[in-house]
Amino acid sequence: MNKIAWAERSCKTNTIGTVNILEILKLIKHKTIAVFITSDKVYKNLEIKRGYKENDILGDYDPYSASKASADLAIQSYYKSCLNKNKNVKIATARAGNVIGGGDWSPNRIIPDCVTKWSQ
């Protein structure tokens, strides 16, 4: 996959996909909890020797990180502008590192490691 196609796919999956889910949550009439698992890639890589903090700068120089940060910002803005008014919907985000990606079954990823352990 060339870089432009990869960038477009990242944006569609991470940003637009998240917005699609948020739009559905606006319509929910029953009690629902949505947990968005994002990534540490939402943060700008400053090459610091500590873990990221919630108030660190979002976004970086590659399309993948930008799409992750955009999704995270969409979640925040939807919550502040409309979802906080719907008492049936609760949302949360969790920024985890090394969860999984499309076709990513590398070792030391949360989802593949869980699947491996559960299947034993």
Predicted region positions:
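Catalytic helix-loop patch of NAD(P)-dependent Rossmann-fold dehydrogenases
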Residues: 5-23, 30-33, 42-99, 105-106
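A generic alpha-to-beta junction signature in SAM-dependent methyltransferases
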Residues: 28-29, 118
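Residue(s) in the substrate-gating loop at a strand-loop-helix junction
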Residues: 39
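Serine-hydrolase catalytic-loop signature spanning alpha/beta hydrolases and amidase-signature enzymes
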Residues: 1-3
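Alpha-helical substrate-binding/gating segment
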Residues: 83, 111-120
